[in-house]
Amino acid sequence: MKAQTAIDTRQFIQQYFDAWEESVAEKILSYYSDDVVIDVLGVPALLEGKPAVAENFVLPFTRAFPGNVHKILNFIHQGNQVVIEWMFTAVHKGEFSDMPATARTVNVPGCSVYTIEGDQITRGHIYFNGPTLLKQLGAAS
């Protein structure tokens, strides 16, 4: 594993979040190792491998919220681990969780914990406030 500085890792994470804003699934997925394991709060099973991450995480969010922005609020780096507190801002333009597009803007806080090996994410834990997202979409009170 190559040594990673906090500056290098922050640039890597910013580029990863920029790929989300571009909403090109293949570009987002290029930041993950082939055998990546992602645990997303609210998703009942671990997402193991790029196909599972694409189908159950990347594609649902990029289709529903194209052009989404992750603003980094806090960044902590230690070795090959990084913790990012972020604000997700997007307009609901496509179906999400069986809900048709509402054209509503959402602002949802979240946090990601990633393990980075070389230049790829190998493991991730993603926490965000699902009830806040659904409330902002008009699905929950």
Task: Put a short name on every predicted segment.
Residues 1-141:
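C-terminal and inter-domain tail/linker signature
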